[in-house]
A protein has these predicted regions:
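Repeated scaffold domains used in trafficking and secretory/extracellular systems
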Residues: 26-35, 59-68, 98-106, 138-146, ...
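Conserved core beta-strand positions within WD40 beta-propeller blades
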Residues: 2, 37, 70, 109-111, ...
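Conserved beta-strand positions in repeat-built beta-propeller and related beta-rich domains
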Residues: 5-9, 40-45, 73-77, 112-117, ...
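Inter-blade boundary loops/turns of WD-repeat beta-propellers
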Residues: 16, 43, 51-52, 76, ...
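Structural motif
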Residues: 10-13, 46-49, 79-83, 118-122, ...
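An edge-strand/N-cap motif at the start of beta-rich repeat modules
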Residues: 1-25, 29-33, 286
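A short beta-strand motif characteristic of beta-propeller blades
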Residues: 17-23, 52-57, 87-95, 129-134, ...
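Blade-level signature of beta-propeller repeat domains, shared across WD40, Kelch, NHL, RCC1
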Residues: 230-286
């Protein structure tokens, strides 16, 4: 099992130990796994890098996703969702909410957290045509998809901050609140067993299937921004505390710190020989 991390030290890969992968981006903030490839974004300097190509990003990019072999970006500054062609040039741009800050891909659709407009927007791919908008309580800020069921974090109140965790079925339109939690929206992810992991405020919580009560509640985080689940492992990136952690989820155990320092997006990738593209061939310790 291999882990990728965007950090102040560059793109890092962990498979038993950390390696630095040479790229033109000195300080990547976001990443997206596209098969055996990894796309990187430096949202501060507005740079995108993939397969040896460097291109320009719109301002305020919050999210980088991969659909098939094409990239998607979501900008909270332009309020737009953008689909790129196979050479990473902007292909289609569509308005998507007010200060949108997260999205998830389900088959040939992308679900966008419209944030300040109070809606979850559904766009078709590849034409980025809006086909539905679901009004939800508060400002939806984080979303994860489990088939046709969305799990979301929505900010109900900023002072003091309160976050609503809820599920929404795209097939039936059924809305199901899970929990009202103290703190800011951080991150949400769905495990292989369809249970929920959520970072809210300074906590990491786990909700079993069909339960409104967490069976795991861990504290002492800054504000978790990225979560990724795979094969009973949970990868955690906590930029506010400046650390990346890994934990077993079955049964849950204490998170193990993998990296300390300024960090951003993270994801799992294959660790099998031969799956990495040529630009990753020269590996050095960070």
């Amino acid at each position: 099992m291999e882990v990728y991390l965007a950090s102040a030290a560059g793109l890092l890969s962990w498979c038993g130990k950390w390696r630095k992968i040479p790229t033109p981006l000195a300080h990547p903030t976001l990443l997206a796994a596209c098969g055996a490839d990894v796309a990187l974004a430096d949202s501060v300097n507005r740079l995108l890098y993939r397969q040896g190509r460097v291109s320009t990003l719109p301002p305020g990019v919050e999210v980088l996703r991969c659909w098939r072999n094409q990239l998607l970006t979501l900008s909270s500054e332009t309020n737009c969702l953008t689909l790129y062609d196979a050479h990473d040039y902007p292909l289609i741009t569509s308005p998507a909410g007010i200060r949108p800050c997260d999205c998830a891909i389900v088959d040939c659709q992308v679900i966008v957290c419209g944030c300040e407009d109070g809606c979850l927007h559904i766009f078709s791919l590849p034409d980025l045509r809006e086909i539905a908008a679901y009004p939800v309580p508060g400002c939806p800020m984080r979303v994860a998809a489990d088939g046709r069921v969305l799990t979301c974090l929505s900010l109900l109140s900023p002072d003091p901050p309160q976050t609503l965790l809820f599920r929404l079925c795209l097939t039936s339109g059924d809305f199901a609140p899970v929990a009202l939690l103290p703190g800011w929206c951080g991150a949400v992810a769905i495990a292989d067993d369809h249970t929920i992991w959520a970072g809210v405020g300074e906590q990491l919580l786990h909700f079993p299937l069909d339960s409104v009560v967490p069976d795991v509640q861990l504290g002492e985080f800054g504000l978790i921004r990225f979560l990724s689940c795979q094969q009973s492992k949970l990868l955690i990136s906590d930029p506010w505390a400046g650390r990346c952690l890994l934990m077993d989820t079955t049964p849950p155990s204490a998170p193990h710190q993998l990296y300390a320092g300024e960090c951003g997006g993270c994801c799992f990738a294959s660790c099998r020989k031969g799956t990495l593209p040529d630009w990753k061939a020269s590996l050095n310790e960070p």
